[in-house]
A protein has these predicted regions:
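A cross-domain feature marking catalytic cores of carbohydrate-active enzymes
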Residues: 55-57, 83-87, 109-111, 149-151, ...
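Alpha-helical scaffold elements lining the catalytic groove of polysaccharide deacetylases
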Residues: 61-66, 115-140, 153-199, 211-218
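C-terminal domain-boundary segment and adjacent tail
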Residues: 34-47, 72-78, 211-256
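Hydrophobic membrane-insertion alpha-helices, especially the h-region
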Residues: 2-18
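Short low-complexity, flexible loop/linker segments enriched in glycine and/or proline
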Residues: 97-100, 123-125, 184-188, 245-249
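Hydrophobic single-pass membrane-insertion segments
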Residues: 16-26
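Active-site beta->alpha N-cap acidic-glycine motif
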Residues: 26-120, 124-138, 142-144
Length: 256
């Protein structure tokens, strides 16, 4: 049904949930929870100075100009990025979605709307994942296997459903707070002051935010000076043989 032949077996222990799924012809195994609490992927222990820029594109937003400006900045800065887009955004901006992929970025799935985490069900999640995969398939041959729920709130049922369907829930470890009504320079200052960037950080931006592009233009050169390289979520996240920490950090069980 999912195009990846997903099958999951969850084994619950006192400390973690071990997940086995068949994706295509490969069986993957991972521990996706801590103390019975399922966790989305927020960052990755890469062993390399890598970071992933992610941008959210919602169907309720109309800032085409901001997205085009962002693409120019990403090209100038030589940053490959991951765009989490809703099905409605892709349908309403199909040519722009194709342009995103043609410029070396990737499109992954974003839930259509923010809902109370208690209202999320496995059935609704499966339906949304199916719609997202079908829609992403209209603009790129690359499968959409990463999924983000708006607002970043998950529950165990939804997370287990995402994993069981052969997908990976991805949140973030660094929030740009680009929705705040501050100048880009001040937002960058606050970001660097509030957190210490480490390898495998997943940075969250709004692709249609008025200050998002300027923030990236100011932030990335500073991180580049410190030796950080930008990669896509697909290039950074482990698909197999990993465990999670309490803050949603992927730890490899063996070499990638």
């Amino acid at each position: 049904m999912w195009g990846v032949g997903a099958l999951a077996l969850v084994l619950i222990t006192g400390l973690s949930v071990f997940y086995r799924a068949q994706v295509g012809k490969k069986v993957v195994t991972a521990s996706t929870s801590v103390n019975g609490q399922e966790l989305p992927i927020c960052s990755v222990q890469t062993g390399k100075k890598q970071i992933a820029y992610t941008f959210e594109l919602s169907g309720t937003q109309t800032g085409k100009g901001q997205v085009e400006q962002m693409l120019q900045i990403l090209q100038q800065q030589e940053i490959p990025a991951t765009f989490f887009a809703t099905p409605s955004w892709i349908e309403n901006h199909r040519s722009l979605a194709i342009q995103i992929c043609q410029q070396g970025h990737e499109i992954q799935g974003l839930g259509e709307q923010v809902v109370c985490v208690e209202q999320m069900t496995a059935k609704a999640c499966r339906k949304e994942l199916r719609k997202i995969r079908e829609t992403i398939g209209t603009v790129t041959e690359e499968p959409g296997v990463f999924f983000r729920i708006p607002g970043g709130e998950y529950n165990n049922e939804v997370l287990r459903t995402i994993y069981a369907c052969g997908s990976y829930p991805v949140a973030w470890s660094v929030d740009s707070m680009d929705w705040k009504e501050y100048e880009a320079g001040e937002l960058v200052r606050q970001l660097l002051q509030s957190c210490t960037i480490r390898d495998g950080e997943i940075l969250r931006f709004h692709g249609e935010g008025e200050d998002s592009g300027e923030m990236v233009k100011l932030l990335h050169p500073r991180l580049k000076e410190e030796g950080y390289e930008a990669v896509t979520v697909s290039q950074m996240v482990y698909k197999d043989c990993y465990r999670m920490t309490t803050d949603g950090r992927q730890i490899p069980e063996k070499s990638k």
